[in-house]
């Protein structure tokens, strides 16, 4: 019987380790997504900085040509052309993107920690209840423990398979979400880069053309420069709105997937509780027959030795009473009540967790 009890404890220990493994894999996936996003953002900023620097250097060269044509009002024109109007907008865009990434990281960590705590807490409570049930059966010396152990071992294997499948599903979904975000970010980045190139190339051409007759068109140059700066600012604002909307959409998908995974896990736990209840119901039925027989034999023996002169009806009543009492005692062992309490605790925790997701 000691070997059976040890095996029951080992099986539940493996379930607890499985929950810890799920937590480690979730953290690895989260770190991978965060690091890749930061690398992409860094590359995007580097490319934009290089494009801006190169384009504005060309415009500055055009400004030198302007100085050869006019002397009056040159400081105003020079300031208008050589100041980088998009620099502040790019800094704002970088700040907003970094803030958005930090918020997504905090929210994702909270969801993953809640799921991890649910798995770990459920495994520990189930382990405690199983050890209690196993000890009760071991103390009674019931041979039925062998059958219960076989069913429990099969149940533990099925639970581990379900956990592995759910882990694979979450991992695949995480990879898919990251790929979608990366593809969408690359598309938006290419749009910004292409639009920036068009704006700065236009500035270069316009600057060279207007430099030849700047004496007449000084105000026009200033207006065109302001217009190009406004175009770039609007494009940056539109890009940030698209990124923000896409991030919110992906966060909603992640929450939905987390909720579905939680429901599937809770259903699997409920299924295992149902199997245990069925096994213990059979055990109670058999105990009822055994204790009923004990009551019947005990009643017959007692009436033969203690009440030899009693009437047949009195003897029959006494024997039937002991048999009924024994049967009732056997049928109402508290196994399923223990299982029900454990299930209700796990279900209540699941509902609390769903409110936090």
UniProtKB/Swiss-Prot annotation:
The keyword Glycoprotein applies. Glycans are attached at residues 114, 157, 172. Residues 5-51, 150-177, 223-270 form a coiled coil. Induction: Induced by srfA, during development. Down-regulated by phagocytic stimuli. Up-regulated by Legionella pneumophila infection. Rapidly up-regulated by hyperosmotic stress, which is dependent on dstC. Shows early transcriptional response to sorbitol exposure. Keywords: Coiled coil, Glycoprotein, Membrane, Transmembrane, Transmembrane helix. Residues 17-29 have a biased composition (Basic and acidic residues). Disulfide bonds: none annotated. It is a single-pass membrane protein. Its main location: membrane. GO terms for biological process: hyperosmotic response. It is found in: Membrane. GO terms for cellular component: membrane. Residues 1-29 are annotated as: Disordered. Gene3D superfamilies: Apolipoprotein. The chain crosses the membrane at residues 290-307. This is SrfA-induced gene J protein. It comes from Dictyostelium discoideum (Social amoeba). The lineage of its organism: Eukaryota, Amoebozoa, Evosea, Eumycetozoa, Dictyostelia.
């Amino acid at each position: 019987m000691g070997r059976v009890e040890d095996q029951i404890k080992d099986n539940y220990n493996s379930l607890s380790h499985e929950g810890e493994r799920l937590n480690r894999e979730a953290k690895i996936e989260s770190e991978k997504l965060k690091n890749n996003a930061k690398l992409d953002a860094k590359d995007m900023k580097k490319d934009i900085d290089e494009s801006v620097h190169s384009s504005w250097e060309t415009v500055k060269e055009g400004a030198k040509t302007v100085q050869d044509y006019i002397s009056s009002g040159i400081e105003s024109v020079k300031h208008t052309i050589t100041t980088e109007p998009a620099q502040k907008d790019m800094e704002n865009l970088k700040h907003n993107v970094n803030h958005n990434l930090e918020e997504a990281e905090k929210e994702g960590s909270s969801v993953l920690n809640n799921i991890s705590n649910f798995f770990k807490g459920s495994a520990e409570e189930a382990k405690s209840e199983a050890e209690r049930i196993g000890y009760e059966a071991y103390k009674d010396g019931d041979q039925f423990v062998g059958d219960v152990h076989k069913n429990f071992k099969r149940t533990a294997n099925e639970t581990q398979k379900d956990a592995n499948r759910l882990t694979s599903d979450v991992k695949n979904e995480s990879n898919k979400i990251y790929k979608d975000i990366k593809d969408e970010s690359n598309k938006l980045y290419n749009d910004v880069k292409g639009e920036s190139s068009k704006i700065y190339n236009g500035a270069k051409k316009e600057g060279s053309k207007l430099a030849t007759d700047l004496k007449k068109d000084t105000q026009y140059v200033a207006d065109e420069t302001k217009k190009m700066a406004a175009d770039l600012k609007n494009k940056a604002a539109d890009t940030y709105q698209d990124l923000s909307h896409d991030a919110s959409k992906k966060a909603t998908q992640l929450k939905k997937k987390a909720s579905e995974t939680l429901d599937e896990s809770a259903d699997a736990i409920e299924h295992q509780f149902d199997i245990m209840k069925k096994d213990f119901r059979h055990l109670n039925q058999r105990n009822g027959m055994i204790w009923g027989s004990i009551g019947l034999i005990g009643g017959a023996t007692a009436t033969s030795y203690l009440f030899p002169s009693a009437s047949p009806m009195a003897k029959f009543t006494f024997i039937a009473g002991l048999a009924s009492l024994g049967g009732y005692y056997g049928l109402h062992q508290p196994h399923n009540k223990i299982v029900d309490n454990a299930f209700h605790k796990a279900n209540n925790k699941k509902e609390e967790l769903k409110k936090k997701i």
